[in-house]
Design a protein with these regions (language model features):
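Short acidic loop-to-beta-strand element that houses the catalytic metal-binding Asp/Glu
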Residues: 1-2, 228
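Acidic, metal/cofactor-coordinating or nucleic-acid-engaging core segments within structured domains
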Residues: 3-15
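Extended hydrophobic secondary-structure segments that form protein cores and membrane-embedded regions
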Residues: 23-31
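Composition-driven low-complexity segments enriched in polar/acidic and proline residues
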Residues: 33-228
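A general structural signal for short secondary-structure junctions and capping/turn motifs
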Residues: 15-21
Length: 228
C-alpha cells in the first residue's frame, strides 16, 4: 500500500499520506519460534511463496523482544533490517538462531559479510527450483549457504545476569562503532533534519576502512577550518 498507493485509508475515510516515505521494510512477527524458516528464506523464494524484491524479516516475538532490549537506536535497527532482508545475507548465510545474526551484526561482521558478498558475487544466487538435473536456469550457480557459528555467549551471559540467574556482572552487548562517529550520528539525530534516520543508518553501515577515513577527516577539520 505504501509503495503502490503512497498512503492508506484510515477510519472515517481519512487518507494517510505516506508519499514522503523513502524506504519500506517488511516484518513478520510470529508468536512461536520460527528460526529455521526465518533464516532459510531462499527455499521460500525458490518455491514461489515470495519474491526476491521485498524479502521480509521473519522473527519470533521472543527474539524481537531480546533485540529491542539491546537496541537503543532506530537507525541501528534500520541497518539491521537492511542487512537481514538483503538477498546476499538472506540467501548465503544460515543459522538456527536469529540472535546469532544479531550478535554478528553488533560485532560489525554482518555489514562486512554484506559487502564481501556484493563484491565477490558476479551473479545473484540461483533461485530456480531444483528439477534434479543439476541444471538451473537464469540465476547463476547455486552455492551452499554458509552456516554461522554461535555468537550468543556474551548475550546469554548478559540475559542470565539481568534475569538474576547469574551474579557475574556483564555489560549489555553494543554495536562496535568509533566514538567520533557515534558523536556525529548523535548530532544528526538531535537536529532531526530531513532524512536523519536513513543518513544515520548509512553512517553505521560504513565499512571499517571507510570509518577510519571519515574519522581521520573529522579529526583534521578543526585545523582546516582555522586555515580558511
Amino acid at each position: 500500500l505504501i509503495t503502490v498507493n503512497s498512503g492508506v485509508w484510515l477510519d472515517h475515510q481519512q487518507w494517510l499520506d505516506l508519499s514522503a516515505v523513502k524506504e519500506v521494510r517488511s516484518l513478520v512477527v510470529c508468536l512461536d519460534e520460527v528460526s529455521p524458516l526465518s533464516t532459510d528464506l531462499v527455499e521460500l523464494v525458490r518455491a514461489g511463496v515470495m519474491g526476491v524484491d521485498n524479502i521480509p524479516w521473519i522473527v519470533s516475538m521472543h527474539d524481537l523482544m531480546v533485540i529491542s532490549e539491546i537496541n537503543e537506536d532506530p537507525a541501528l535497527f534500520l541497518l539491521y533490517l537492511r542487512c537481514r532482508t538483503d538477498p546476499s545475507v538472506a540467501f548465503r548465510l544460515a543459522s538456527s538462531d536469529e540472535l546469532d545474526f544479531y550478535m554478528r551484526f553488533l560485532m560489525g561482521l554482518l555489514v562486512e559479510d554484506l559487502e564481501v558478498h556484493h563484491r565477490l558475487s558476479a551473479r545473484p544466487p540461483d533461485l530456480s527450483p531444483d528439477d534434479g538435473s543439476g541444471v538451473h536456469g537464469g540465476f547463476g550457480h547455486r552455492r551452499p549457504a554458509q552456516q554461522l557459528l554461535s555468537h550468543t555467549d556474551d548475550l546469554d551471559a548478559w540475559v542470565y545476569f539481568e534475569q538474576g540467574h547469574s551474579e557475574v556482572a556483564v555489560e549489555k552487548p553494543a554495536f562496535h562503532f568509533p566514538e567520533q562517529l557515534q558523536n556525529l550520528v548523535a548530532k544528526i539525530k538531535r537536529q532531526e533534519i530531513a532524512g536523519w534516520l536513513r543518513a544515520s543508518a548509512d553512517l553505521y553501515g560504513l565499512q571499517q576502512d571507510q570509518q577510519r577515513q571519515l574519522v581521520n577527516m573529522l579529526t583534521k577539520l578543526p585545523a582546516l577550518a582555522k586555515r580558511s
